[in-house]
Amino acid sequence: SKRAQVSFVKNKERDLAVIALLLSTGVRLSELVNLDMQDVNLATRTITVIRKGGKKDVVNIAPFGLPYIERYLEIRKGRYSASDSDKAFFLTTQNKVPARLGTRSVELLVKKLSTAYGKPTTPHKLRHTLATRLYEQTKDSLLVSQQLGHKGTAMVEVYAHVAAETTKEALSDL
């Protein structure tokens, strides 16, 4: 529809930055939508989030996510009528007034863009993807659990299992 096209064009940089940040950090949806401008440090490639249980944590951003985040920041002020008092990192507009992008909006935009790409997914599956790839790359459960903000390494066994399945499939393809 015409409205959907207008929305896509208006929000393209933001939506790609949302997906890039989810994929390049593995943060939870709640951590993403609660990000403020002061929490994002591109110079150090980190974001500061409030984890489950209210604990502050500094999370590294994989380099591939940076160009999308930088592009969004270039258009954020003008496109979303943001002033310095608009602290939310990801914005939408309601009646031309900037507002924090909500969890449901992020779920819908991830679903819409990923479905259009032929790979329907969710914000949590993007977190899972980062964890699996990081584990495959490092085989380091502690490193993966720290990146995801898990208290222990038990949850990482899920990603290790996925990596083992991937290995099995790869061997079958030889």
Q: What residue ranges belong to the model's regions?
A:
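Conserved catalytic core of the tyrosine transesterase superfamily
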Residues: S1-L174
